[in-house]
UniProtKB/Swiss-Prot annotation:
Self assembles to form an icosahedral capsid, about 50 nm in diameter, nm, composed of 420 subunits of the viral capsid protein. The capsid encapsulates the genomic dsDNA. Following virus entry into host cell, provides nuclear import of the viral genome. Virus particles do not enter the nucleus, but dock at the nuclear membrane through the interaction with host importins. One of its GO terms (cellular component) is host cell. This is Capsid protein. The lineage of its organism: Viruses, Riboviria, Pararnavirae, Artverviricota, Revtraviricetes. Its main location: virion. Residues 135-144 have a biased composition (Polar residues). GO terms for molecular function: nucleic acid binding; structural molecule activity; zinc ion binding.
Amino acid sequence: MAESILDRTINRFWYNLGEDCLSESQFDLMIRLMEESLDGDQIIDLTSLPSDNLQVEQVMTTTEDSISEEESEFLLAIGETSEEESDSGEEPEFEQVRMDRTGGTEIPKEEDGEGPSRYNERKRKTPEDRYFPTQPKTIPGQKQTSMGMLNIDCQTNRRTLIDDWAAEIGLIVKTNREDYLDPETILLLMEHKTSGIAKELIRNTRWNRTTGDIIEQVIDAMYTMFLGLNYSDNKVAEKIDEQEKAKIRMTKLQLCDICYLEEFTCDYEKNMYKTELADFPGYINQYLSKIPIIGEKALTRFRHEANGTSIYSLGFAAKIVKEELSKICDLSKKQKKLKKFNKKCCSIGEASTEYGCKKTSTKKYHKKRYKKKYKAYKPYKKKKKFRSGKYFKPKEKKGSKQKYCPKGKKDCRCWICNIEGHYANECPNRQSSEKAHILQQAEKLGLQPIEEPYEGVQEVFILEYKEEEEETSTEESDGSSTSEDSDSD
């Protein structure tokens, strides 16, 4: 009797572990029971349940003496519940996986009979490595809300976070109106669902709990404090200002590359929905006119095909644009195929209608081979031995060049005294020279001396004739000739 009760209670314990949350004392009691009653030759069956927790069915043998009074009462209570469920005819289905608790040589059998598997190859050395599932922190099967905490500290997308959080708070309050009739409970909910500066704002602000919607007051205050939008005092003016900014941005938007169509449409659509619905048709026409290449054709199609509510649909206009874009892509593919088309295949369709006409021919295409501009490896050059004078070439001697005398420099030669270092008007000998008198007369007439008009080396040659020296030289030459004749005689 004790064995059957123990088996059923243990089975119900591991089966209900994924559905009912046991207390810590009950859980510890069952674990201690299993550790004391198990022998070394016992086998544990692991079972998988619909929940995420692993459930284990243990087959144990024990005696009546090993069960205390407190433990038997607890086991009998669980056994009664298991008997009631077994009478109903509903039994859980387990996927049995047998494994040796002590890591022995027992190997599970294969269904196909091919041979032993390698499931139990890894042996457990110490009993401390035994696996026992822990108590689950949350009740399995319980649905949890997907709403998180609102934390907008140092966030860039604050408006999106506030809008999502406000939508979920409003959904909770509207679906549970009986629990949130008092503004205090709503503020308590909003305070516990925020953190950081948003929580400090809700906690430290005095809210008007008598008039108006408390959720709307909190959202307007967040818009004012964290986004800089004055929704608390003048909400209408802020919305009008947002509409004007959206209109200006839609006017400035440009699409230069058709490949960025998706990004352009997303930006344009986001700003268009900030305006009034009655102005949508005009903005859609403006959107189509901004698209290059296919914008005009898409605009004519939109005017003919749009009717009813589709006149206000930017998505319908974007659909037409994509259809026209796909047509152009197909046409470009056909043009690429036509370039590769062989004209010799035209005679297959019908007989030739040209007689005596010059046949069209095309030049053969020779593919230009690619030549590497660099080598894959660095060439190694042996360093040559230095030999002095082998490749020495003496420098050419260059003559002395005349110094160039630009205007304003005092390194030219004076034409009065023929000395470098000063001009003629500054010459110290100009008073005693005839050239100086000419210079003074020129200064009276308002004339200034200029540089020498001639460039290069200038030389003066003087040729003088002396008759007396020539006569003496001739006489000496005659005397010498007569003396030579006498000696010869």
